[in-house]
């Protein structure tokens, strides 16, 4: 496939007032038209475990991603680690609704960043013609009060756009029930809802200045969304894209332990007084695990 997704965004000029301040931007249609092709929807199919009923079940989660590069074999998509965490299967949907299989390439759990790969051979030429590679901006140049635009797969319903301003810079957030705690974030009042994680936070030039990552959820709180600054992400992403893409291995070539299990979350450790590690939900008969004396539970 020779089609190249090399369109860059960021051609909208900003008006200067008194040579010092940007005018208030209310019409972002041209910025959005240019930027939407570089944002994708991500579906994560994973196995969840109900400790109360002692059973596994299939679950699906939705997020977003930003197309940041293309090489000879693949498109590279930046997203949050929590969007792809524990995935059995990943799927990416482009702006034209084409959906293809995706693979984890590199992850940085502590920084809540990940790079996902889509093989070019899996993407129809027609779809390649509709997508774009994002222009990355300079998050260090952001100022409180300037306009911001968030694009993402809100609630899993497909791409949507919200606007606001940069509310604060260098913010730290900590949630007691979350393993990931982030610092030096961008705060915006552009709505960031479930499914927006991994999507793009743009400036008025259409440049990606942040990766939408989280929102403080409380009935008394409005307009507090957070994004990882693109300048913070750059050196991490530079290393992640060098890693080998993790493709599925044929069943007959896989190592086989003989158990079904799931990681014990911090929430489960607290609620059920379980130790840290892997909870064994079943042991297959005749396997090495059974012979070693591993038991269910």
PLM features: residue spans?
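Extended hydrophobic-aromatic, low-complexity segments
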Residues: 268-272, 290-293
């Amino acid at each position: 496939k020779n089609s190249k997704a090399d369109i860059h965004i960021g051609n909208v000029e900003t008006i200067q007032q008194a040579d010092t301040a940007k005018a208030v931007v209310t019409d972002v249609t041209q910025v959005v038209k240019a930027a939407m092709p570089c944002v994708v929807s991500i579906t994560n199919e994973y196995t969840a475990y109900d400790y109360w009923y002692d059973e596994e079940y299939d679950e699906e989660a939705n997020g977003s991603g930003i197309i940041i590069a293309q090489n000879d074999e693949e498109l590279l998509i930046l997203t949050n680690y929590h969007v792809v965490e524990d995935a059995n299967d990943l799927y990416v949907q482009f702006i034209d609704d084409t959906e293809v299989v995706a693979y984890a390439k590199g992850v940085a759990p502590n920084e809540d960043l990940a790079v996902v790969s889509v093989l070019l051979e899996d993407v129809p030429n027609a779809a390649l013609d509709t997508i774009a590679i994002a222009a990355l901006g300079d998050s260090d140049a952001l100022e409180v009060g300037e306009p911001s635009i968030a694009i993402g797969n809100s609630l899993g319903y497909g791409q949507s756009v919200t606007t606001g301003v940069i509310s604060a810079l260098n913010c730290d957030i900590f949630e007691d029930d979350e393993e990931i705690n982030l610092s030096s974030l961008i705060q915006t009042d552009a709505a960031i809802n479930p499914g927006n994680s991994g999507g793009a936070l743009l400036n008025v030039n259409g440049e990606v200045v942040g990766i939408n990552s989280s929102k403080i959820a409380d009935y008394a709180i409005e307009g507090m969304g957070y994004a990882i600054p693109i300048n913070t992400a750059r050196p991490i992403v530079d290393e992640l894209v060098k890693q080998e893409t993790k493709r599925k291995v044929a069943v007959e070539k896989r190592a086989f332990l003989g158990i079904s299990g799931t990681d014990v979350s911090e929430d489960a450790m607290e609620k059920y007084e379980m130790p840290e590690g892997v909870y064994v939900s079943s042991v297959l008969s005749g396997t090495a695990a059974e012979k070693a004396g591993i038991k269910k539970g």
